[in-house]
Amino acid sequence: KDWPAEERLYRFDASNDFAVYFGDPDHPLPLAEAKTQLMTIRDSTLVTLRIALGIWNLRKHNPSLISPTGRIPITYDEILAWQGRRKHSYVSGGKRITDGYRPEDREEVRDDLKLASMIYLKGDRTIYINGRQQKSHFEGRYIDVTFWDYPSLFSGEKPRLQGVTFVPGGWMDAYASANNIYLAEIDRRVFQLHKHHEQHALRLAFFLADEWRSHAYDTHHDYIFTMAELLARSVIRVDKRNLTNRLAPSIEKSLELLRARGIIGSYECLAPIDKSKPQWGNDWLASRWRILPPESLLQSYMAKGIAQPSASTQARLSPPKHRRGRTPKGG
């Protein structure tokens, strides 16, 4: 994402109408320092943040895990596992030994969360409380984290990085009344996917759950993406060499898996691709896809007076008919 500099801050306008700032607007970093920090943001930063928000949304209902201030513990190893990262291993005595994630892997997750904690939101939104519109102003951190680690037992060694206590900023409270129960159920289903064998499905699900959450107060919920946009926003790399023989089948299989698991309500390609043509991969990347939230989430929005069903939403509140068969495995 390009972050233009505005006055003393880098900022951009998000698709949900919030102004997103890098750094505290009241105590801004020097622009040169802020730019240096921004350049360290990578694809994993977004994936890490989505995973942490999903874990928080699940654990906040567990009184043994959540603190009075709404914080929940998350270890770096949990996030690395959901990213699909493999643990370090080596061969000894003819056997392969696994000794966990490398310290530098944990440092990457720590850096991701530290960068995300420097993001601030500011803006006015119309929210719905008991079916009535109400103007609200939001300003503050996107997330708040406290880092913890274990001191080393040996002099000169670095502490062992463990994890964070994590809580979203106050912006989350505004959305809680809209979709709290239903999004928690979606997150529960997402975290039942396989960490390694269903990574494409996980990346798509993390993005789409984030989309349902951040656009909860939109009046319409027709989500249309080009396939290239869907992959980019889901942080899925496009392998051009294996586009038609591996990536495209895996993504379409993953979408069907998400529908079968109730993580999305329905999906369709608005102009089907002629896959009998040679080199159809670019057409597939440019194709437009409509993806709807689960029926339970849409109906809860309409019951609360938040959403108004468009013609396409109304027609697709029930999942489309699919051939019977086993639930697909992977992505």
Please provide the spans of the model-predicted regions.
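Charged, alpha-helix-forming regions
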Residues: 1-331
